[in-house]
């Protein structure tokens, strides 16, 4: 059985697709030109990068060894301690 046939009969959830996209990353580039009577009125150069923060950090460091969420959180805490800046994502109510 080919890969295509095996995938046709398999239910794939949206969360599975998002998991793969965030793990590997996706780059999308496109151009949008709006013109009337052959005159270009609007030109948009679109570039979108969808990835998790962990994937981007690994790519920037050139580190291909996987980093766990716990290691990433530890590095984030060390960086916040070094800079003296509190995390803007913490809940001020403490819950």
Curated annotation (Swiss-Prot):
A Gene Ontology term for the protein's cellular component: vesicle membrane
Disulphide-bonded residues: none
Residues forming coiled coils: none
Keywords: Gas vesicle
Segment forming the signal sequence: none
Practical and industrial applications: The minimal pNL29 gvp locus overexpressed in E.coli can be filled with Xe and used as a contrast agent for ultrasound and magnetic resonance imaging. Engineered gas vesicles (GV) can be used for noninvasive imaging in E.coli and mice. Heterologous GVs with 2 copies of gvpA plus gvpC from D.flosaquae and the gvpR-gvpU operon from this bacterium make GVs suitable for imaging of bacteria deep in mouse tissues (e.g. the gastrointestinal tract), or when expressed in tumor-homing bacteria, can be detected in tumors.
Top-rank lineage group of the source organism: Bacteria
Localization, UniProt: Gas vesicle
Keyword check for Nucleotidyltransferase: no
Annotated Pfam families: Gas_vesicle (PF00741)
Keyword Transmembrane: no
Molecular-function GO terms, alphabetical: structural molecule activity
Functional description taken from the UniProt entry: Probably a minor component of the gas vesicle. It is not clear what function gas vesicles perform in soil bacteria. When a minimal gvp locus (gvpA2-gvpR-gvpN-gvpF-gvpG-gvpL-gvpS-gvpK-gvpJ-gvpT-gvpU, called pNL29) is expressed in E.coli gas vesicles are made.
Similarity-based family: Belongs to the gas vesicle GvpA family.
The name this protein goes by in its record: Gas vesicle protein S
Name of the encoding gene: gvpS
């Amino acid at each position: 059985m080919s890969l295509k046939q095996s995938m046709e009969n398999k239910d794939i959830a949206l969360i599975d697709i998002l998991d793969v996209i965030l793990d590997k990353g996706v780059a999308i580039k496109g151009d949008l030109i709006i013109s009337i009577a052959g005159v270009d009125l609007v030109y948009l150069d679109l570039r979108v990068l969808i990835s998790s923060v962990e994937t981007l950090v690994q790519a920037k460091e050139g580190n291909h060894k996987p980093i766990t969420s716990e290691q990433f959180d530890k590095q984030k805490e060390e960086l916040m301690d070094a800079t003296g800046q509190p995390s803007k994502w913490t809940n001020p109510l403490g819950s």
